[in-house]
């Protein structure tokens, strides 16, 4: 990942006469890490809450179930390791996230913050528990939905955008995964979560740091001069996916996706669009106008007939093929992650000899794991000129559990070149690992065993099979497995197995999408 040429943390160009950012940033030393994230000492989170089971693993922290000691109420606690915060700007990012959650806490469709706590190792954000699951998962589980249902969802999503903008907040990472239902009840409200990339802004402010998630990022973000209009584009992408099951602009690589976003044609003609109402298509067009000055504002979206008038959005079920595509799109391909790790650990001593010695040299305390500081110091000793964000990206590609350390196998998976991982004998070796009975096929039972070995839970095994199973026989043969491993690796896939559609880097979040405009703007190869 190449750092942006501008200084880290400088991402905004002020319009003439624009005032200072509100609220003011944390008072901190101008260099190095500040003493704390929060501007005041806090109680220990465990004095007020019992921390329970892990609910989820994000890129920036781990979320746990917690129970309030006074009231017995259930909440979510997001714990962010402070060792992941490398500099003053990272500390400010976390503090800003907390401020923004408080700032928006009265909105009925924003997850409500309960409080923030800090100790020597973590910042803990306690918030409302949303136990109803992600937006797309609910739709897929239900098995059918209508344009009218999609209109209600978009009304909620864009209502959050309008609420943010009216309070001087830009979300900057709107995507379906960041919307959760409050409970499993049929009428549970949809809530926006994860304000880790959000910023305060004033009218006229322009930003230049490239953040977000590939399918949902607006073209002006890629061009590094944007404002709150970018949130409306992202909401428009969600609407497009709700209506047809796939993103409007897609390709096999990140750079290909970005090229399509900048100049690809918006398809509103092929199936299922002929059966979608003209009013819905009109709204999609106006939310996905590349010129942000001509794009609908959030308020204009909420005033559109398709949103306002229940009679305009048809109540007939949307084609079941859309639901099927939506299911596949939203299912994460965990199989590839596991396979990359298997290959990395089975390579020959000759291929990994240098890396093995490097690992030993970096692991100064011979613990069998390396920390960020050990990695940074070790690379410096061998003359590496990697910048801190690049070292952190290397670390984080392997540190899947946010433990702050990586073991030998993880180190290999994160540092080996993709061409070694793709060699035929290595693919055969990885396939054999999953094909426990040597039948020549990976079955759903064998996948289940592998997931258990890798500590993966809540995995949709059927979807993992379907993502790869080209001939629809319910299992994965070698040719299908090899095609999956080679798919999408051109143009900067990383050997750590982090999917190209997985959003931003780690806590050092600015300029986190690997955007090379020269690469994006080159002529299409097809």
Curated annotation (Swiss-Prot):
Top-level class of the enzyme under EC nomenclature: transferase
SMART domains: EFh (SM00054), S_TKc (SM00220)
EC number: 2.7.11.1
Catalytic center residues: 173 (proton acceptor)
Chain residues that bind ATP: 55-63, 78
This protein's GO CC annotations: cytoplasm; nucleus
Species this chain originates from: Oryza sativa subsp. japonica
Positions of the Protein kinase domain: 49-307
GO biological process, one term: intracellular signal transduction
Sequence segments annotated as region (Autoinhibitory domain): 313-343
Keyword terms, alphabetized: ATP-binding, Calcium, Kinase, Metal-binding, Nucleotide-binding, Repeat, Serine/threonine-protein kinase, Transferase
Binding site residues for Ca(2+) 4: 469, 471, 473, 475, 480
Residue sites binding Ca(2+) 1 per the record: 363, 365, 367, 369, 374
Pfam family, one: EF-hand_7
Reaction(s) this enzyme catalyzes, per UniProt: L-seryl-[protein] + ATP = O-phospho-L-seryl-[protein] + ADP + H(+); L-threonyl-[protein] + ATP = O-phospho-L-threonyl-[protein] + ADP + H(+)
Binding-site residues for Ca(2+) 2, renumbered to this chain: 399, 401, 403, 405, 410
Cell membrane recorded as keyword: no
Protein's gene: CPK28
Sequence ranges assigned to domain EF-hand in this UniProt record: 350-385, 386-421, 422-457, 460-491
Source taxon at top rank: Eukaryota
Residues annotated to bind Ca(2+) 3: 435, 437, 439, 446
Function of the molecule: May play a role in signal transduction pathways that involve calcium as a second messenger.
Regulation acting on activity, per entry: Activated by calcium. Autophosphorylation may play an important role in the regulation of the kinase activity.
Protein name: Calcium-dependent protein kinase 28
